[in-house]
Amino acid sequence: MKNITDYIQQWANTYKDDMQNNIMPFWIKYGLDRVNGGIYTCVDRDGALMDSTKSVWFQGRFAFTCSYAYNHIEKNPAWLQAAKSTLDFIEKYCFDSDGRMYFEVTADGRPLRKRRYIFSESFAAIAMSEYSIASGDKTYAVKALELFKRMQYFLQTPGLLAPKYRDTLPMKGHSITMI
């Protein structure tokens, strides 16, 4: 290895190759729900569906990953279409009437669980933002900003997000700042 730049470039090429030839093809082939939209989140290494429930934050992560890969790795129309399908699923099924997002839904979008934190919202917002860049559809930039502002409201309004710990042992988690 000549220098650190060559070393970093070698790893960048390895990761890019893995995304193009392994990760993205696998999830496009086995993960996409071609009936209801969105992405299945529990498939085995052979692509067999193990559980049809869908993690909502994973929907956002997948839509972001597809959009980001489209913007930075390869202008693959299948990736952009997968991002759009997943965002359509999110918008149609993953928001509760109070503006918060569910944590988990059935394959056809019926709510199963809702959590006290805003991970689903975080990943949906970055997915919408990146998709706006990939597609040129600025309405998704507006949606991302609106969702981000809603997240700020949830975080800054006492009582909207239930505390994880009781007052007997005050603590502050780092998950929100990491997201």
Labelled PLM ranges:
Residues M1-I179:
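Glycan-recognition and catalytic cores of secretory/periplasmic carbohydrate-active enzymes
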